[in-house]
UniProtKB/Swiss-Prot annotation:
GO terms for cellular component: eukaryotic 43S preinitiation complex; eukaryotic 48S preinitiation complex; eukaryotic translation initiation factor 3 complex. It comes from the Eukaryota. Keywords: Cytoplasm, Initiation factor, Protein biosynthesis. It is found in: Cytoplasm. One of its GO terms (molecular function) is translation initiation factor activity. This is Eukaryotic translation initiation factor 3 subunit L. Belongs to the eIF-3 subunit L family. It comes from Culex quinquefasciatus (Southern house mosquito). Component of the eukaryotic translation initiation factor 3 (eIF-3) complex.
Amino acid sequence: MYSNDDYAEGGYEEYGYEMAADDGYDRSFYPMHEDVKKFLVYFCSVIKGGVVYEIQNLYENTFPKLSEQHFEKKAWPSEDEVAHLVDNDNLFMILYKELYYRHLHARIQGGPSLEQRLNSFYNYCNFFNYILPSKEPVQLELPDIWLWELIDEFVYQFQNFAQYRARLTDKSDEEMDMLLNNNSKVWNILCILNVLHSLVSMSKIKDQLEAAAAGRDPEEVAGEFGRHSFYKMLGYFSLVGLLRVHSLLGDYHQAIKVLEPIELHKKSQYSHIPACQISTSYYVGFAYMMMRRYSDAIRTFSSILLYIQRTKQLYSARSYQNDQINKQTDQMYHLLAICLVLHPQCIDESIQQVLREKNYHDNMYKMQCGDLDTFRNFFVFACPKFVSPVPPPSDAPLDDYVKEALEHQTNVFMDEVRQQQELPTIRSYLKLYTTLPLLKLASFMDHIPQDEIGEQKIENLLTHLLCFKHKMKNIVWTKGASGLEGKFQSGSELDFYIDKDMIHIADTKVSHRYGDFFIRKILKFEDLNRRLHNLKG
Protein backbone atom coordinates (compact mmCIF):
# COMPACT_ATOMS: atom_id res chain seq x y z
CA MET A 1 0.00 0.00 0.00
CA TYR A 2 2.50 2.63 1.17
CA SER A 3 6.24 2.23 1.38
CA ASN A 4 8.88 3.98 3.46
CA ASP A 5 10.26 5.56 0.29
CA ASP A 6 7.06 7.54 -0.18
CA TYR A 7 7.67 9.49 3.02
CA ALA A 8 11.29 9.21 4.11
CA GLU A 9 12.65 12.00 1.91
CA GLY A 10 9.59 14.18 1.40
CA GLY A 11 9.94 16.16 4.59
CA TYR A 12 7.24 17.21 7.01
CA GLU A 13 4.26 19.10 5.61
CA GLU A 14 2.71 21.61 8.01
CA TYR A 15 -1.06 21.44 8.39
CA GLY A 16 -3.01 24.66 8.75
CA TYR A 17 -6.50 25.03 10.17
CA GLU A 18 -8.94 27.35 11.82
CA MET A 19 -9.76 26.22 15.33
CA ALA A 20 -13.15 26.71 16.94
CA ALA A 21 -13.26 29.49 19.49
CA ASP A 22 -14.79 27.38 22.21
CA ASP A 23 -14.90 23.61 22.11
CA GLY A 24 -15.58 23.02 25.79
CA TYR A 25 -17.53 19.94 26.64
CA ASP A 26 -21.24 20.64 27.07
CA ARG A 27 -21.61 20.68 30.84
CA SER A 28 -23.10 22.93 33.47
CA PHE A 29 -20.60 25.42 34.85
CA TYR A 30 -18.91 24.53 38.09
CA PRO A 31 -16.07 26.31 39.90
CA MET A 32 -12.65 24.77 39.43
CA HIS A 33 -11.42 22.92 42.51
CA GLU A 34 -8.53 24.56 44.29
CA ASP A 35 -6.37 21.44 44.10
CA VAL A 36 -6.94 21.31 40.32
CA LYS A 37 -5.83 24.94 40.00
CA LYS A 38 -2.69 24.29 42.04
CA PHE A 39 -1.95 21.18 40.00
CA LEU A 40 -2.23 23.02 36.66
CA VAL A 41 -0.03 25.92 37.79
CA TYR A 42 2.60 23.56 39.21
CA PHE A 43 2.40 21.25 36.18
CA CYS A 44 3.10 24.21 33.91
CA SER A 45 6.07 25.32 36.01
CA VAL A 46 7.79 21.89 36.04
CA ILE A 47 7.30 21.50 32.26
CA LYS A 48 8.88 24.92 31.76
CA GLY A 49 11.71 23.90 34.07
CA GLY A 50 12.25 20.55 32.32
CA VAL A 51 12.15 18.57 35.59
CA VAL A 52 11.48 15.20 33.95
CA TYR A 53 11.11 13.04 37.07
CA GLU A 54 8.55 15.47 38.55
CA ILE A 55 6.70 15.78 35.22
CA GLN A 56 6.47 11.98 35.17
CA ASN A 57 5.13 11.88 38.73
CA LEU A 58 2.43 14.46 37.95
CA TYR A 59 1.57 12.78 34.64
CA GLU A 60 1.46 9.18 35.90
CA ASN A 61 0.08 9.72 39.39
CA THR A 62 -1.46 13.12 40.09
CA PHE A 63 -3.35 13.64 36.81
CA PRO A 64 -5.08 10.19 36.92
CA LYS A 65 -5.86 10.69 40.63
CA LEU A 66 -7.51 14.07 40.02
CA SER A 67 -9.37 12.61 37.04
CA GLU A 68 -10.83 9.93 39.32
CA GLN A 69 -11.75 12.41 42.04
CA HIS A 70 -13.24 15.27 40.02
CA PHE A 71 -13.67 14.25 36.37
CA GLU A 72 -14.77 10.61 36.41
CA LYS A 73 -17.48 11.15 33.78
CA LYS A 74 -16.99 14.74 32.73
CA ALA A 75 -14.40 16.84 30.96
CA TRP A 76 -11.46 18.63 32.51
CA PRO A 77 -11.72 22.46 32.50
CA SER A 78 -11.81 23.99 29.02
CA GLU A 79 -8.97 25.89 27.41
CA ASP A 80 -10.49 29.26 28.33
CA GLU A 81 -10.73 28.30 32.00
CA VAL A 82 -7.11 27.15 32.17
CA ALA A 83 -5.24 29.62 29.95
CA HIS A 84 -5.32 32.57 32.38
CA LEU A 85 -3.98 30.37 35.21
CA VAL A 86 -0.79 29.65 33.26
CA ASP A 87 -0.34 33.08 31.64
CA ASN A 88 -1.50 31.74 28.28
CA ASP A 89 1.61 29.58 27.96
CA ASN A 90 1.23 28.25 24.40
CA LEU A 91 3.28 25.05 24.77
CA PHE A 92 1.66 24.06 28.05
CA MET A 93 -1.81 24.63 26.58
CA ILE A 94 -0.98 22.30 23.66
CA LEU A 95 0.14 19.59 26.09
CA TYR A 96 -2.83 20.20 28.39
CA LYS A 97 -5.27 19.90 25.49
CA GLU A 98 -3.62 16.64 24.44
CA LEU A 99 -4.55 15.25 27.87
CA TYR A 100 -7.95 16.98 27.75
CA TYR A 101 -9.00 15.34 24.47
CA ARG A 102 -7.52 12.01 25.48
CA HIS A 103 -9.69 12.11 28.62
CA LEU A 104 -12.77 12.89 26.47
CA HIS A 105 -12.12 9.86 24.28
CA ALA A 106 -11.54 7.56 27.25
CA ARG A 107 -14.10 8.65 29.84
CA ILE A 108 -17.04 10.54 28.31
CA GLN A 109 -20.01 8.36 27.48
CA GLY A 110 -20.85 8.51 23.79
CA GLY A 111 -17.40 9.84 22.98
CA PRO A 112 -16.41 13.32 21.84
CA SER A 113 -18.45 15.38 19.40
CA LEU A 114 -17.33 15.92 15.80
CA GLU A 115 -16.10 19.41 16.68
CA GLN A 116 -14.01 18.03 19.54
CA ARG A 117 -12.54 15.32 17.28
CA LEU A 118 -11.55 17.99 14.77
CA ASN A 119 -10.04 20.24 17.42
CA SER A 120 -8.08 17.32 18.87
CA PHE A 121 -6.55 16.80 15.43
CA TYR A 122 -5.74 20.51 15.17
CA ASN A 123 -4.07 20.37 18.57
CA TYR A 124 -1.84 17.49 17.42
CA CYS A 125 -1.01 19.62 14.36
CA ASN A 126 0.01 22.42 16.73
CA PHE A 127 2.31 20.06 18.63
CA PHE A 128 3.95 18.56 15.55
CA ASN A 129 4.22 21.97 13.85
CA TYR A 130 6.06 23.12 16.98
CA ILE A 131 8.67 20.32 17.03
CA LEU A 132 9.13 19.23 13.40
CA PRO A 133 9.81 22.34 11.26
CA SER A 134 12.23 23.71 13.88
CA LYS A 135 15.81 24.24 12.61
CA GLU A 136 17.22 23.24 15.99
CA PRO A 137 15.99 20.93 18.78
CA VAL A 138 13.18 22.47 20.82
CA GLN A 139 13.76 23.02 24.52
CA LEU A 140 11.27 20.45 25.76
CA GLU A 141 11.76 17.37 27.90
CA LEU A 142 8.95 14.91 28.55
CA PRO A 143 9.08 11.46 30.19
CA ASP A 144 9.25 8.50 27.80
CA ILE A 145 5.91 7.15 29.03
CA TRP A 146 4.16 10.38 27.95
CA LEU A 147 5.89 10.33 24.54
CA TRP A 148 4.76 6.73 24.00
CA GLU A 149 1.18 7.43 25.05
CA LEU A 150 1.09 10.57 22.91
CA ILE A 151 2.01 8.62 19.74
CA ASP A 152 -0.24 5.71 20.75
CA GLU A 153 -3.17 8.07 21.33
CA PHE A 154 -2.49 9.89 18.03
CA VAL A 155 -2.87 6.59 16.13
CA TYR A 156 -5.85 5.55 18.28
CA GLN A 157 -7.73 8.78 17.54
CA PHE A 158 -7.05 8.32 13.81
CA GLN A 159 -8.53 4.81 14.07
CA ASN A 160 -11.46 6.05 16.14
CA PHE A 161 -12.21 8.89 13.72
CA ALA A 162 -12.04 6.54 10.70
CA GLN A 163 -14.69 4.36 12.36
CA TYR A 164 -16.78 7.40 13.35
CA ARG A 165 -16.59 8.73 9.78
CA ALA A 166 -17.67 5.37 8.31
CA ARG A 167 -20.85 5.30 10.43
CA LEU A 168 -23.25 7.44 8.37
CA THR A 169 -26.51 6.39 10.00
CA ASP A 170 -26.20 8.53 13.16
CA LYS A 171 -25.05 11.84 11.62
CA SER A 172 -27.06 15.04 11.23
CA ASP A 173 -27.07 16.90 7.89
CA GLU A 174 -24.75 19.51 9.41
CA GLU A 175 -22.25 16.84 10.52
CA MET A 176 -22.39 15.17 7.10
CA ASP A 177 -21.66 18.51 5.46
CA MET A 178 -18.72 19.13 7.80
CA LEU A 179 -17.29 15.66 7.12
CA LEU A 180 -17.72 15.63 3.35
CA ASN A 181 -16.98 19.21 2.36
CA ASN A 182 -14.89 21.03 4.93
CA ASN A 183 -12.58 18.56 6.64
CA SER A 184 -11.24 16.16 4.02
CA LYS A 185 -7.68 16.39 5.40
CA VAL A 186 -8.61 15.95 9.06
CA TRP A 187 -7.33 12.60 10.36
CA ASN A 188 -6.33 11.79 6.78
CA ILE A 189 -4.18 8.65 6.39
CA LEU A 190 -1.52 10.51 4.40
CA CYS A 191 -1.26 13.09 7.18
CA ILE A 192 -0.80 10.37 9.81
CA LEU A 193 1.89 8.62 7.76
CA ASN A 194 3.59 11.94 7.01
CA VAL A 195 3.86 12.81 10.70
CA LEU A 196 5.14 9.39 11.79
CA HIS A 197 7.69 9.10 8.97
CA SER A 198 8.86 12.67 9.61
CA LEU A 199 9.52 11.86 13.28
CA VAL A 200 11.43 8.71 12.26
CA SER A 201 13.47 10.66 9.71
CA MET A 202 14.26 13.63 11.97
CA SER A 203 15.41 11.41 14.85
CA LYS A 204 17.55 9.19 12.56
CA ILE A 205 16.34 6.36 14.77
CA LYS A 206 16.87 3.76 12.04
CA ASP A 207 20.51 4.78 11.62
CA GLN A 208 20.95 4.69 15.40
CA LEU A 209 19.44 1.20 15.69
CA GLU A 210 21.60 -0.11 12.83
CA ALA A 211 24.73 1.40 14.41
CA ALA A 212 23.91 -0.16 17.80
CA ALA A 213 23.32 -3.56 16.15
CA ALA A 214 26.72 -3.30 14.46
CA GLY A 215 28.42 -2.50 17.78
CA ARG A 216 29.03 1.17 16.95
CA ASP A 217 28.12 4.25 18.96
CA PRO A 218 24.62 5.46 17.91
CA GLU A 219 25.65 9.02 18.80
CA GLU A 220 27.92 9.04 15.72
CA VAL A 221 24.93 8.87 13.36
CA ALA A 222 22.22 10.47 15.53
CA GLY A 223 22.56 13.96 14.13
CA GLU A 224 21.64 17.17 15.94
CA PHE A 225 18.07 16.09 16.74
CA GLY A 226 18.59 12.36 17.35
CA ARG A 227 21.05 13.03 20.17
CA HIS A 228 18.17 14.38 22.24
CA SER A 229 16.17 11.74 24.09
CA PHE A 230 12.95 13.63 23.24
CA TYR A 231 13.39 13.19 19.47
CA LYS A 232 15.02 9.77 19.68
CA MET A 233 12.17 8.23 21.66
CA LEU A 234 9.50 9.94 19.54
CA GLY A 235 11.21 8.39 16.51
CA TYR A 236 11.26 4.93 18.04
CA PHE A 237 7.64 5.09 19.17
CA SER A 238 6.68 6.33 15.69
CA LEU A 239 8.08 3.09 14.23
CA VAL A 240 5.67 1.20 16.50
CA GLY A 241 2.91 3.62 15.48
CA LEU A 242 3.60 2.80 11.81
CA LEU A 243 3.45 -0.92 12.64
CA ARG A 244 0.00 -0.35 14.11
CA VAL A 245 -1.26 1.85 11.25
CA HIS A 246 -0.23 -0.64 8.55
CA SER A 247 -1.77 -3.49 10.55
CA LEU A 248 -5.05 -1.57 10.82
CA LEU A 249 -5.00 -1.16 7.03
CA GLY A 250 -4.29 -4.87 6.48
CA ASP A 251 -0.82 -4.32 4.98
CA TYR A 252 1.04 -6.90 7.08
CA HIS A 253 4.22 -7.07 5.01
CA GLN A 254 4.74 -3.32 5.34
CA ALA A 255 3.84 -3.49 9.04
CA ILE A 256 6.80 -5.81 9.70
CA LYS A 257 9.05 -3.99 7.23
CA VAL A 258 8.86 -0.62 9.01
CA LEU A 259 10.41 -2.29 12.08
CA GLU A 260 13.41 -3.68 10.17
CA PRO A 261 16.08 -1.87 12.23
CA ILE A 262 14.56 -3.32 15.42
CA GLU A 263 15.64 -6.83 16.37
CA LEU A 264 12.18 -8.03 17.33
CA HIS A 265 13.29 -11.05 19.34
CA LYS A 266 15.88 -9.27 21.49
CA LYS A 267 15.54 -6.93 24.44
CA SER A 268 16.92 -3.43 23.95
CA GLN A 269 17.29 -0.12 25.76
CA TYR A 270 14.04 0.97 24.08
CA SER A 271 11.88 -1.79 25.58
CA HIS A 272 11.55 -0.17 29.03
CA ILE A 273 7.96 0.97 28.43
CA PRO A 274 5.86 -2.19 29.00
CA ALA A 275 2.82 -0.92 27.08
CA CYS A 276 4.99 -0.23 24.03
CA GLN A 277 6.67 -3.63 24.22
CA ILE A 278 3.33 -5.44 24.58
CA SER A 279 1.64 -3.46 21.80
CA THR A 280 4.59 -4.16 19.48
CA SER A 281 4.40 -7.89 20.13
CA TYR A 282 0.62 -7.94 19.63
CA TYR A 283 0.75 -6.31 16.20
CA VAL A 284 3.90 -8.17 15.10
CA GLY A 285 2.41 -11.52 16.16
CA PHE A 286 -0.87 -10.75 14.43
CA ALA A 287 0.91 -9.70 11.21
CA TYR A 288 2.94 -12.93 11.27
CA MET A 289 -0.25 -14.96 11.73
CA MET A 290 -1.95 -13.29 8.77
CA MET A 291 1.19 -13.91 6.66
CA ARG A 292 0.92 -17.62 7.60
CA ARG A 293 4.21 -17.48 9.52
CA TYR A 294 2.75 -19.37 12.46
CA SER A 295 6.05 -20.37 14.10
CA ASP A 296 7.14 -16.73 14.29
CA ALA A 297 3.69 -15.72 15.57
CA ILE A 298 3.78 -18.41 18.28
CA ARG A 299 7.28 -17.39 19.37
CA THR A 300 6.27 -13.71 19.48
CA PHE A 301 3.10 -14.33 21.50
CA SER A 302 4.74 -16.87 23.85
CA SER A 303 7.68 -14.58 24.61
CA ILE A 304 5.55 -11.54 25.50
CA LEU A 305 2.98 -13.59 27.44
CA LEU A 306 5.79 -15.02 29.59
CA TYR A 307 7.00 -11.46 30.20
CA ILE A 308 3.47 -10.40 31.20
CA GLN A 309 3.21 -13.37 33.58
CA ARG A 310 6.40 -12.27 35.35
CA THR A 311 5.33 -8.62 35.60
CA LYS A 312 1.54 -8.90 35.95
CA GLN A 313 1.50 -7.08 39.30
CA LEU A 314 2.42 -3.90 37.37
CA TYR A 315 -0.90 -3.90 35.50
CA SER A 316 -3.32 -4.35 38.39
CA ALA A 317 -3.95 -0.63 39.02
CA ARG A 318 -6.75 0.88 36.94
CA SER A 319 -5.57 3.10 34.10
CA TYR A 320 -6.27 3.41 30.39
CA GLN A 321 -2.93 1.80 29.45
CA ASN A 322 -3.31 -1.04 31.97
CA ASP A 323 -6.83 -1.76 30.72
CA GLN A 324 -5.41 -1.86 27.20
CA ILE A 325 -2.59 -4.20 28.28
CA ASN A 326 -5.02 -6.59 29.97
CA LYS A 327 -7.25 -6.61 26.89
CA GLN A 328 -4.32 -7.22 24.53
CA THR A 329 -3.11 -10.03 26.79
CA ASP A 330 -6.47 -11.78 26.48
CA GLN A 331 -6.45 -11.19 22.72
CA MET A 332 -2.97 -12.69 22.39
CA TYR A 333 -4.03 -15.87 24.20
CA HIS A 334 -6.87 -16.20 21.66
CA LEU A 335 -4.49 -15.64 18.74
CA LEU A 336 -1.98 -18.09 20.22
CA ALA A 337 -4.73 -20.71 20.50
CA ILE A 338 -5.59 -20.21 16.81
CA CYS A 339 -1.93 -20.53 15.79
CA LEU A 340 -1.44 -23.71 17.85
CA VAL A 341 -4.46 -25.33 16.18
CA LEU A 342 -3.25 -24.41 12.69
CA HIS A 343 0.40 -25.18 13.43
CA PRO A 344 0.84 -27.44 16.51
CA GLN A 345 4.16 -27.17 18.33
CA CYS A 346 5.62 -27.26 21.84
CA ILE A 347 5.35 -24.09 23.92
CA ASP A 348 6.37 -23.17 27.46
CA GLU A 349 4.57 -25.21 30.11
CA SER A 350 3.42 -22.12 32.04
CA ILE A 351 1.65 -20.80 28.92
CA GLN A 352 0.05 -24.21 28.42
CA GLN A 353 -1.12 -24.06 32.03
CA VAL A 354 -2.91 -20.74 31.43
CA LEU A 355 -4.55 -22.14 28.29
CA ARG A 356 -5.81 -25.07 30.38
CA GLU A 357 -6.96 -22.97 33.34
CA LYS A 358 -8.92 -20.54 31.15
CA ASN A 359 -10.61 -23.35 29.19
CA TYR A 360 -9.02 -22.47 25.87
CA HIS A 361 -8.48 -26.19 25.27
CA ASP A 362 -12.22 -26.81 24.84
CA ASN A 363 -12.41 -24.26 22.05
CA MET A 364 -9.11 -25.45 20.58
CA TYR A 365 -10.61 -28.94 20.36
CA LYS A 366 -13.64 -27.49 18.52
CA MET A 367 -11.32 -25.74 16.07
CA GLN A 368 -9.33 -28.95 15.55
CA CYS A 369 -12.62 -30.64 14.64
CA GLY A 370 -13.25 -27.99 11.98
CA ASP A 371 -15.70 -25.72 13.84
CA LEU A 372 -15.53 -22.60 11.64
CA ASP A 373 -17.74 -20.53 13.99
CA THR A 374 -15.20 -20.91 16.81
CA PHE A 375 -12.38 -19.83 14.50
CA ARG A 376 -14.40 -16.80 13.43
CA ASN A 377 -15.38 -15.82 17.00
CA PHE A 378 -11.78 -16.09 18.22
CA PHE A 379 -10.52 -14.03 15.30
CA VAL A 380 -13.15 -11.28 15.59
CA PHE A 381 -12.48 -10.93 19.34
CA ALA A 382 -8.69 -10.88 19.04
CA CYS A 383 -8.00 -8.95 15.83
CA PRO A 384 -7.30 -5.18 15.65
CA LYS A 385 -10.15 -2.81 14.81
CA PHE A 386 -9.44 -2.53 11.09
CA VAL A 387 -10.18 0.70 9.25
CA SER A 388 -10.49 1.80 5.65
CA PRO A 389 -7.89 4.39 4.54
CA VAL A 390 -10.61 6.39 2.74
CA PRO A 391 -14.11 7.51 3.83
CA PRO A 392 -17.29 6.25 2.16
CA PRO A 393 -18.02 8.07 -1.15
CA SER A 394 -20.04 11.27 -0.87
CA ASP A 395 -22.91 9.68 -2.81
CA ALA A 396 -22.90 6.44 -0.77
CA PRO A 397 -26.23 5.33 0.75
CA LEU A 398 -26.66 6.22 4.42
CA ASP A 399 -25.40 3.04 6.03
CA ASP A 400 -22.92 1.76 8.62
CA TYR A 401 -19.65 1.00 6.81
CA VAL A 402 -17.60 0.41 9.97
CA LYS A 403 -17.56 -3.38 9.70
CA GLU A 404 -16.55 -3.55 6.03
CA ALA A 405 -12.81 -3.60 6.78
CA LEU A 406 -13.27 -6.17 9.56
CA GLU A 407 -15.43 -8.40 7.38
CA HIS A 408 -12.87 -8.27 4.57
CA GLN A 409 -9.98 -9.31 6.84
CA THR A 410 -12.14 -11.96 8.52
CA ASN A 411 -12.99 -13.44 5.11
CA VAL A 412 -9.30 -13.51 4.17
CA PHE A 413 -8.51 -15.38 7.39
CA MET A 414 -11.46 -17.78 7.08
CA ASP A 415 -10.47 -18.65 3.49
CA GLU A 416 -7.12 -19.81 4.87
CA VAL A 417 -8.82 -21.78 7.64
CA ARG A 418 -11.11 -23.55 5.16
CA GLN A 419 -8.08 -24.65 3.17
CA GLN A 420 -6.74 -26.30 6.31
CA GLN A 421 -10.03 -27.64 7.64
CA GLU A 422 -9.21 -31.31 6.97
CA LEU A 423 -5.59 -31.16 8.12
CA PRO A 424 -6.11 -31.80 11.88
CA THR A 425 -8.09 -34.95 11.03
CA ILE A 426 -5.39 -36.16 8.63
CA ARG A 427 -2.74 -35.42 11.26
CA SER A 428 -4.63 -37.40 13.92
CA TYR A 429 -4.70 -40.52 11.68
CA LEU A 430 -1.09 -40.22 10.50
CA LYS A 431 0.14 -40.02 14.12
CA LEU A 432 -1.23 -43.53 14.74
CA TYR A 433 0.78 -45.27 12.00
CA THR A 434 4.25 -45.62 10.53
CA THR A 435 2.84 -46.85 7.21
CA LEU A 436 -0.69 -46.33 5.98
CA PRO A 437 -2.23 -47.23 2.59
CA LEU A 438 -3.87 -44.34 0.74
CA LEU A 439 -7.01 -46.42 0.32
CA LYS A 440 -7.28 -46.99 4.07
CA LEU A 441 -6.80 -43.31 4.92
CA ALA A 442 -9.42 -42.33 2.32
CA SER A 443 -11.80 -44.79 3.97
CA PHE A 444 -11.14 -43.22 7.40
CA MET A 445 -11.68 -39.70 6.05
CA ASP A 446 -14.97 -40.44 4.27
CA HIS A 447 -16.29 -43.04 6.74
CA ILE A 448 -17.06 -45.56 4.00
CA PRO A 449 -15.70 -49.08 3.24
CA GLN A 450 -12.49 -49.31 1.21
CA ASP A 451 -14.20 -51.14 -1.67
CA GLU A 452 -16.42 -48.08 -2.23
CA ILE A 453 -13.48 -45.67 -2.60
CA GLY A 454 -13.19 -44.40 -6.18
CA GLU A 455 -10.44 -42.60 -8.10
CA GLN A 456 -11.91 -39.18 -7.29
CA LYS A 457 -11.72 -39.85 -3.52
CA ILE A 458 -8.04 -40.81 -3.85
CA GLU A 459 -7.36 -37.66 -5.91
CA ASN A 460 -9.05 -35.51 -3.26
CA LEU A 461 -7.00 -37.18 -0.52
CA LEU A 462 -3.75 -36.58 -2.43
CA THR A 463 -4.74 -32.92 -2.74
CA HIS A 464 -5.26 -32.70 1.05
CA LEU A 465 -1.93 -34.45 1.71
CA LEU A 466 -0.15 -32.02 -0.61
CA CYS A 467 -1.92 -29.17 1.21
CA PHE A 468 -0.68 -30.63 4.53
CA LYS A 469 2.91 -30.60 3.24
CA HIS A 470 2.54 -27.06 1.92
CA LYS A 471 0.82 -25.52 4.94
CA MET A 472 3.20 -27.07 7.47
CA LYS A 473 6.23 -25.53 5.76
CA ASN A 474 6.68 -21.89 6.78
CA ILE A 475 9.31 -19.20 6.56
CA VAL A 476 10.80 -18.92 10.07
CA TRP A 477 13.00 -16.07 11.29
CA THR A 478 16.46 -17.26 12.35
CA LYS A 479 18.69 -14.19 12.62
CA GLY A 480 19.09 -10.59 11.52
CA ALA A 481 17.26 -7.31 12.10
CA SER A 482 14.64 -7.90 9.41
CA GLY A 483 11.57 -9.67 10.71
CA LEU A 484 10.68 -10.57 7.11
CA GLU A 485 13.77 -12.70 6.54
CA GLY A 486 13.92 -16.38 7.40
CA LYS A 487 14.31 -19.91 6.16
CA PHE A 488 11.72 -22.46 5.11
CA GLN A 489 11.21 -24.95 7.91
CA SER A 490 8.73 -27.73 8.51
CA GLY A 491 6.87 -27.13 11.74
CA SER A 492 4.85 -30.33 11.80
CA GLU A 493 5.30 -32.92 14.53
CA LEU A 494 5.41 -35.57 11.82
CA ASP A 495 6.63 -35.93 8.26
CA PHE A 496 5.71 -38.36 5.52
CA TYR A 497 6.30 -39.34 1.93
CA ILE A 498 4.17 -41.35 -0.51
CA ASP A 499 5.63 -44.33 -2.35
CA LYS A 500 3.12 -45.61 -4.91
CA ASP A 501 -0.04 -46.28 -2.83
CA MET A 502 1.63 -46.30 0.60
CA ILE A 503 2.16 -43.39 3.00
CA HIS A 504 5.37 -43.68 5.07
CA ILE A 505 5.24 -41.62 8.27
CA ALA A 506 8.01 -40.42 10.61
CA ASP A 507 7.27 -38.87 14.02
CA THR A 508 9.49 -35.80 14.50
CA LYS A 509 7.89 -34.59 17.73
CA VAL A 510 10.31 -33.22 20.30
CA SER A 511 9.61 -34.66 23.74
CA HIS A 512 8.69 -32.24 26.54
CA ARG A 513 11.66 -31.13 28.64
CA TYR A 514 10.06 -31.51 32.04
CA GLY A 515 13.44 -31.14 33.78
CA ASP A 516 13.66 -27.42 32.98
CA PHE A 517 10.13 -26.87 34.28
CA PHE A 518 10.84 -28.58 37.63
CA ILE A 519 14.20 -26.81 38.03
CA ARG A 520 12.49 -23.42 37.61
CA LYS A 521 9.81 -24.33 40.14
CA ILE A 522 12.41 -25.59 42.66
CA LEU A 523 14.46 -22.39 42.34
CA LYS A 524 11.32 -20.29 42.74
CA PHE A 525 10.32 -22.27 45.84
CA GLU A 526 13.82 -21.88 47.36
CA ASP A 527 13.74 -18.13 46.74
CA LEU A 528 10.31 -17.90 48.40
CA ASN A 529 11.62 -19.93 51.34
CA ARG A 530 14.58 -17.57 51.79
CA ARG A 531 12.29 -14.55 51.80
CA LEU A 532 10.05 -16.11 54.45
CA HIS A 533 13.08 -16.83 56.67
CA ASN A 534 14.25 -13.22 56.25
CA LEU A 535 10.80 -11.95 57.27
CA LYS A 536 10.90 -14.10 60.42
CA GLY A 537 14.36 -12.81 61.25
